[in-house]
Curated annotation (Swiss-Prot):
Record-given protein name: Probable tRNA sulfurtransferase
Entry keywords, A to Z: ATP-binding, Cytoplasm, Nucleotide-binding, RNA-binding, Thiamine biosynthesis, Transferase, tRNA-binding
Primary localization: cytoplasm
Pathway entry: Cofactor biosynthesis; thiamine diphosphate biosynthesis
Molecular function (Gene Ontology), one example: tRNA-uracil-4 sulfurtransferase activity
EC number: 2.8.1.4
Length: 406
């Protein structure tokens, strides 16, 4: 079957429930769609109250369709053929389309929407006229109003007529950014990218905070984390990647805290740093990939001791999931194979052999009195480096910009 499409009609998901904020949600979804399709300048994207329209202008439909299936906030979309707003031409194009898509034994239905009320026929008359032309040209034609094999949608707009027959399922959820901004603690593991994905699905715009401890962690580990952030851009556009210099803090903790408390105190410092970054950059929540009971720092006792350093809400999207459930999502969003690459992050490099599973808060506070907590956090926050990850080829763009600078 060869059908050349001219436009894609996008239908919104949960936006129908958003009342007075509907316009904001629609504009944000349109922005996200434009970002995801930014390298295809021939596209023209228009968003209106109940749907968005993407004029292809010769762009590769298959590539556009593949990207749209991942954008949160889209319920479904339909590729359309644009034809002249004239009954003889509409009939001719309907017959030509049915020759491509309609087979003996199938049922069909015509569903017309008339946005141009000055058109010569109303919706009912159009349904009858186009149904008749199908019967006239296909002896085996059989109409069925409920759940037909093919529903031909005909939309009469001011500029032209649009024919469509496919509904492609979107990602659902809410447009990224409509729930505000959150800061994702992105390691190089399996869990945190999945947590980021699930936060994106509910409309949270994420900035990815990654703790790097050179020379203990390698440039490869840093690139891996950026590549993981890039995998998440397909769901709603560019992500700001925030690299935190963490070497001083980890060396100080290792020198001044008992081995059993290294992990707990390290996580407390991470929480302090990410909370400061969140505050400075207008975030509302902290997001991490903790899964209850998976490792020593993710018991209820450990989480309680770590959380004590902040009053900011901490969202843990995968907290109740089994590892297999998390892996299933990681494979679905194409982060799993990256996550299992053998680069150590700052937590694994300094991990003690027998960490406390139920650390006492008073002990954490006592050990931290040996350190310049505020000064260390200040220096880490002042040393952050920001990178805009605008797609999976972010490193090529970075190289091109560097070459231009030279």
């Amino acid at each position: 079957m060869t059908v050349l499409y001219d436009e894609i009609m996008v239908r919104y998901g949960e936006l129908s429930t958003k009342g007075k904020n509907r316009g904001y949600f629609i504009n944000r979804l349109a922005k996200n769609i434009r970002e995801v399709l930014a390298d295809m300048p021939e596209l023209k994207i228009t968003a209106v109250r109940d749907r968005a329209h993407i004029e292809l202008n010769g762009a590769d439909y298959a590539e556009v369709s593949n990207r749209l299936t991942k954008v949160f906030g889209i319920q479904n979309f339909s590729p359309s053929i644009k034809v002249e707003k004239s009954m003889p031409i509409i009939k001719k194009e309907v017959v030509a389309l049915f020759k491509e898509i309609y087979s003996e034994g199938q049922t069909f239905k015509i569903a017309t929407r008339r946005a141009d009320h000055n058109f010569e026929l109303d919706s009912t008359e159009l349904n009858i006229a186009l149904g008749d032309v199908v019967f006239d040209n296909f002896s085996y034609a059989k109409v069925q109003m409920k759940k037909p094999d093919i529903t031909l949608r005909v939309e009469i707009r001011q500029d032209a007529t649009y024919l469509s027959f496919e509904d492609i399922k979107g990602a659902g959820g809410m447009p990224v950014g409509t729930a505000g901004r959150g800061h994702l603690m992105l390691s190089g593991g399996i869990d945190s990218p999945v947590a980021g994905y699930l936060a994106l699905k509910r409309g949270v715009e994420i900035e990815a905070v990654h703790f790097a401890s050179p020379p203990y962690t390698s440039p490869g580990a840093l690139k891996k984390a950026k590549d993981l952030a890039a995998k998440l851009t397909v769901f709603g556009g560019a992500i700001t990647f925030i690299e935190v210099p963490f070497t001083e803090i980890q060396e100080e903790i290792k020198a001044k805290a008992p081995q059993a408390y290294l992990m707990t105190i390290t996580r407390r410092f991470m929480m302090r740093v990410v909370d400061r970054v969140r505050e400075e950059r207008g975030g509302k929540v902290i997001i991490n990939g903790e899964s209850l009971g998976q490792v020593a720092s993710q018991t209820l006792g450990s989480m309680s001791a770590i959380n004590e350093v902040t009053n900011t809400p901490v969202i843990r999207p995968v907290v109740t999931m089994d590892k297999n459930e998390i892996i299933e999502i990681a494979e679905k969003i194409d982060t799993f194979n990256l996550s299992i690459l053998p680069f150590e992050d700052c937590c694994t490099v300094f991990a003690p052999p027998s960490p406390k599973t139920n650390p006492k808060l008073e002990n954490c506070i006592q050990y931290e009195k040996r350190m310049d907590v505020e000064g260390m956090v200040d220096r880490a926050v002042k040393g952050i480096m920001l990178t805009t990850i605008a797609g999976e080829n972010w490193d090529q763009t970075e190289e091109e910009e560097f070459a231009d600078f030279l």
